[in-house]
A protein has these predicted regions:
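Non-catalytic regulatory/interaction regions at protein termini and inter-domain linkers
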Residues: 1-4
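Extreme N-terminal signal-anchor transmembrane helix of membrane signaling/transducer proteins, especially
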Residues: 6-32, 190-201
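Juxtamembrane membrane-water interface segments immediately C-terminal to a transmembrane helix
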Residues: 30-54, 184-188
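Short N-terminal helix-loop-first-beta-strand/juxtamembrane motif that initiates sensory/input modules
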Residues: 43, 47-59, 84-106, 136
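Short, hydrophobic beta-strand elements of compact beta-sandwich sensory domains
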Residues: 48, 150-179
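Extracytoplasmic/periplasmic sensor domains and loops in membrane signaling proteins
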Residues: 79-93, 108-144
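A short beta-strand signature within small-molecule sensing/ligand-binding domains used
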Residues: 135-139, 146-157
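Membrane-interface helix-start motif
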Residues: 173-193
C-alpha cells in the first residue's frame, strides 16, 4: 500500500512538468502557426490585388468618369468589367473590387440576393492609408454585406503620376474560412501533443 502511494506521488510529480511543457509547446506552436497563416493570407491577397490592378492598368489611356457615371480606362469600361473580376475570383478564390476614389465601382462580391455590392464607400482607415497616404494596406476586419474578410488594398494611379491615387483595388478572403483552417491545424497540434504526453507517461 505504501509502495503504491509513493508510486502515485512520483507519477503525479512527473506529470505536472510534462503537462506544463505540453501547454507551453501548444501555446507557442499555435501562435507561430496562426501568425504564419495570416502572413501567407496577406501575401496572397497582396499578390491578387496587384495582379488585378495590372490587369486594369494594361489598357491604354487615362482613368476618367463619363457623364453617365461609368469609369473608363482609355477605351475600357471598368464599370462593366464583370468578366474580369469574376474570372479572377474563379482562379484565385478571392473577392476583388475596383474603387474609383473611395466608391466601390466594380466587384466580384455579391449580396444575399446575388446582386453585386456596388456604390458603398471604403472605410475611413482605408481612405487614410491608401488614398491619402498612397500605401498598401492589410486589414483583418473588412465587412461586406455582413461578412467579415481579410483584405488587402493597393492604390491606383494615373500612368506617369504616382503622387495622388485616383482609386484602389481590393482583394479579400472570408475570415471565417481561414479561421476554420487555423483551428483544424491547432487541433492537429493538440492531438500530437496529447499522444506524446501519453507515451511519455
Amino acid at each position: 500500500m505504501m509502495k503504491l502511494t509513493i508510486r502515485k506521488k512520483v507519477l503525479f510529480c512527473s506529470l505536472i512538468p510534462l503537462l506544463l511543457l505540453g501547454g507551453i509547446i501548444l501555446l507557442i506552436a499555435s501562435t507561430i502557426v496562426k501568425g504564419a497563416i495570416i502572413d501567407q493570407v496577406e501575401n496572397s491577397l497582396k499578390g491578387t490585388a496587384i495582379a488585378t490592378q495590372a490587369a486594369y492598368d494594361q489598357n491604354a489611356g487615362t482613368y476618367l468618369q463619363t457623364e453617365n457615371g461609368d469609369i473608363w480606362k482609355g477605351s475600357y469600361n471598368i464599370s462593366q468589367s464583370e468578366n474580369l473580376v469574376d474570372t479572377i475570383k474563379q482562379e484565385s478564390g478571392m473577392e476583388v473590387t475596383f474603387f474609383y476614389g473611395s466608391q466601390r465601382i466594380m466587384t466580384s462580391a455579391v449580396d444575399k440576393n446575388g446582386d453585386r455590392i456596388l456604390g458603398s464607400p471604403a472605410g475611413d482607415k482605408v481612405v487614410e492609408k491608401v488614398l491619402n497616404g498612397g500605401e498598401g494596406y492589410f486589414s483583418d476586419n473588412v465587412s461586406m454585406d455582413g461578412i467579415i474578410y481579410y483584405g488587402y488594398y493597393v492604390p491606383v494611379y494615373q500612368k506617369g503620376d504616382n503622387t495622388t491615387p485616383i482609386g484602389m483595388v481590393f482583394a479579400g478572403a472570408e475570415k471565417q474560412e481561414i479561421s476554420h483552417s487555423v483551428i483544424q491545424i491547432i487541433n492537429t497540434i493538440v492531438a500530437i501533443v496529447l499522444v506524446v504526453l501519453v507515451i511519455c507517461i
